[in-house]
């Protein structure tokens, strides 16, 4: 249904309709309220939802007010209220910005834990990239050399996981066979226990290290230690990992090389 014109009240058809100031107008009825000049969408100015030309557009006029004591008091009171509101907003938003955090022992522990997690993730990514399909053939000889030197195999390099103290369990199992061999020859009754003990000890040359950071084991083949612990029977596996025994707890396993220093 066609709307009515806001000026003359007659029906406005689409061919002559002007939609402006939230009303509908005929093109001929859309003129200035004062001089009746026909306006368009480019040169009109609206005031109280009525069209005006640029010359007759109502202008705001300001009245001069004398600086009486009452007016000065009101002005000063308004400024004080504005200043009070500004301080209130400032105090409300004060805690939402940057604030200095005290370096407490709890925050230091959290920071150290995050550094350890980042270091572990770095080593995991390094191991994954080193054991990828493209570089698997070149890494295999290095892996075998590490197994022969340390008598230890990481779970990621074998199909079935083995117990934590692998070097001590294997020679004990071979001891009865050695005794049977010596008894079959006859006359030689010296026990083969020293041989098994000699193999069970890690071949690290008696190196001793001291822990400079706390470390929590991230895998079953690793050991946990605290700052200041002594690591004995240490042997180097690669640039990033070592194998040794924590003297305080007696646990044996892998540990990161950058968490300890030589004594």
From Swiss-Prot:
Modified residues annotated as Phosphothreonine in this record: 68, 104, 156
Positions carrying N6-succinyllysine: 112
Annotated Pfam families: LIM, Nebulin, SH3_9
Gene3D superfamilies found in the cross-reference section: Cysteine Rich Protein, SH3 Domains
Residues covered by the LIM zinc-binding domain: 5-56
Region (Disordered): 123-207
GO terms of molecular function: actin filament binding; metal ion binding; monoatomic ion transmembrane transporter activity
This protein's record includes keyword Membrane: no
Nebulin repeats: 61-95, 97-131
InterPro entries: Lasp1_SH3 (IPR035630), LIM-SH3_domain_protein (IPR051759), Nebulin_repeat (IPR000900), SH3-like_dom_sf (IPR036028), SH3_domain (IPR001452), Znf_LIM (IPR001781)
Subunit structure: Interacts with F-actin. Interacts with KBTBD10. Interacts with ANKRD54.
Residues with the N6-methyllysine modification: 75
Ranges annotated as biased composition (Polar residues): 148-162
Organism (species): Mus musculus (Mouse)
Sites bearing N-acetylmethionine, chain numbering: 1
Keywords: Acetylation, Actin-binding, Cytoplasm, Cytoskeleton, Ion transport, LIM domain, Metal-binding, Methylation, Phosphoprotein, Repeat, SH3 domain, Transport, Zinc
PANTHER family: LASP (PTHR46218), LIM AND SH3 DOMAIN PROTEIN 1 (PTHR46218:SF2)
Descriptive protein name: LIM and SH3 domain protein 1
Principal subcellular localisation of the protein: cytoplasm
């Amino acid at each position: 249904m066609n709307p009515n014109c806001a000026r003359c009240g007659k029906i406005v058809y689409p061919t002559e309709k002007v939609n402006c100031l939230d009303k509908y107008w005929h093109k001929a009825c859309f003129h200035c309220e004062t001089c009746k000049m026909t306006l368009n969408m480019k040169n009109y100015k609206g005031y109280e939802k009525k069209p005006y030309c640029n010359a007759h557009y109502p202008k705001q006029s300001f009245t001069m007010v004398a600086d009486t004591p009452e007016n000065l008091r009101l002005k000063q009171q308004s400024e004080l209220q504005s200043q009070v509101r500004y301080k209130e907003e400032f105090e409300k938003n004060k805690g939402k910005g940057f604030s200095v955090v005290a370096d407490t022992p709890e925050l230091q522990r959290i920071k150290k834990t995050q550094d350890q997690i980042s270091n572990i993730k770095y080593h995991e990514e390094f191991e994954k990239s080193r054991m990828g399909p493209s570089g698997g053939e070149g890494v295999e000889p290095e892996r075998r050399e590490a197994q022969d030197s340390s008598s230890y195999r990481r779970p990621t390099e074998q199909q079935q996981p083995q117990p934590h103290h692998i070097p001590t369990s294997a020679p004990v199992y071979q001891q009865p066979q050695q005794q049977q061999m010596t008894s079959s020859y006859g006359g030689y009754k010296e026990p083969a226990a020293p041989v098994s003990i000699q193999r069970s000890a890690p071949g690290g040359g008696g190196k001793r290290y001291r822990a400079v950071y706390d470390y929590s084991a991230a895998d079953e083949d690793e050991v946990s230690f605290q700052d200041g612990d002594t690591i004995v029977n240490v042997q180097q596996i690669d640039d990033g990992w070592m194998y040794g025994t924590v003297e305080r707890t007696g646990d044996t396993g892998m540990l990161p090389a950058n968490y300890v220093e030589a004594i």
